[in-house]
Amino acid sequence: MSDSKEPRVQQLGLLEEDPTTSGIRLFPRDFQFQQIHGHKSSTGCLGHGPLVLQLLSFTLLAGVLVAILVQVSKVPSSLSQEQSEQDTIYQNLTQLKAAVGELSEKSKLQEIYQELTQLKAAVGELPEKSKLQEIYQELTQLKAAVGELPEKSKLQEIYQELTQLKAAVGELPEKSKLQEIYQELTQLKAAVGELPEKSKLQEIYQELTQLKAAVGELPEKSKLQETYQELTQLKAAVGELPEKSKLQEIYQELTQLKAAVGELPEKSELQEIYQELTQLKAALGKLPDQSKQQQIYQELTDLKTAFERLCRHCPKDWTFFQGNCYFMSNSQRNWHNSVTACREVRAQLVVIKSAEEQNFLQLQTSRSNRFSWMGLSDLNQEGTWQWVDGSPLSPSFQRYWNSGEPNNSGNEDCAEFSGSGWNDNRCDIDNYWICKKPAVCFRDE
């Protein structure tokens, strides 16, 4: 501000310097001299002119000079006022800068702003007055319910019962006994884990159901029970035999014999088998321990021969395997007609339930070098293979497909035995087919 002020002062100095001389120049005579000197020829022509004209000129010039002096006298005061205003503004700016310096950093301000925003949103989400009243009422009801809790005597009774229960728990078997029980449970769990797969259990359950139905058709219930007891005792006696392989063979024959007994229609045949079992039991009781196994085996062989004279497992031209009968056709039909052909003989287009059954059927078809239909297709949903009985194809059976199959080449939706595995083929192609049904007793004609 000092630099800008000095030029104005210097300009004023030009106007104010040598006031004495300036005052001298303001005398009338000076003006008169100048006027006379400036208009020498005119004055001479006019004869010195009137005095009034000179006074008027002097007055006008004096007014102009006074006005200039007044304006010049105002300049220092305006400059001083401007300087004070600038100082005030500078001080205010300094104070504002200091105040700004004391504010929190930008990140802190943003954080505060965010918190305020969140708080505002939370306040907006507070339940309305009616909701608060509802909560208050629920709290009031809860308080009243607490007041209705059982009295002290009732609580003491509950505590005593808990104490007695704790004491009873303390009387449980000792740790060694618990460990023994735990081991037994572990063994039981392991045994359960070794049970056959679900499909096998279903097959066993179906066989038991069929056996139960056949037993229900026997003529005399008391005779059936007696026969069953005899078989149970015989099974126990067989369990004492030394050789496992021979035991398994005898047990299988007994199982087949039991099934056959359930299927015998005539009372005379049942009595005949019962008599043979009675004789077998009597012979078993009289045999010495060393020859008991051979004698039982011989009796069972004779009994099996007698039974086979009475009936056979499967109809003519059917093949028996593991409780089922299989028919391999000698003519060809498409898949749908093959399903119908099996139904006409009270059978089903073959549904495979086990690896043993698959190996048996694959061997039969490969020996005859025939492409044969099985009861498997994905007609209901592409890529989802299903047996004709409604059961899905087990993931463990996927390995039986030939390499690259099934490929659905040309809309192939039906499965066939092909070579050493399975193949998908068009359902309208003519193939041989295989029917399957449970084995029963068929009498010779």
Swiss-Prot record:
Sugar attachment sites: N92, N407
KW Secreted (keyword) present: no
Residues covered by region (9 X approximate tandem repeats): 108-315
Span(s) of short sequence motif Endocytosis signal: 14-15
Gene Ontology MF term list: calcium-dependent protein binding; D-mannose binding; metal ion binding; pattern recognition receptor activity; virus receptor activity
Span of domain C-type lectin: 320-436
Task of the protein: Probable pathogen-recognition receptor involved in peripheral immune surveillance in liver. May mediate the endocytosis of pathogens which are subsequently degraded in lysosomal compartments. Probably recognizes in a calcium-dependent manner high mannose N-linked oligosaccharides in a variety of pathogen antigens. Is a receptor for ICAM3, probably by binding to mannose-like carbohydrates.
Name this protein carries in UniProt: C-type lectin domain family 4 member M
Native source species: Pan troglodytes
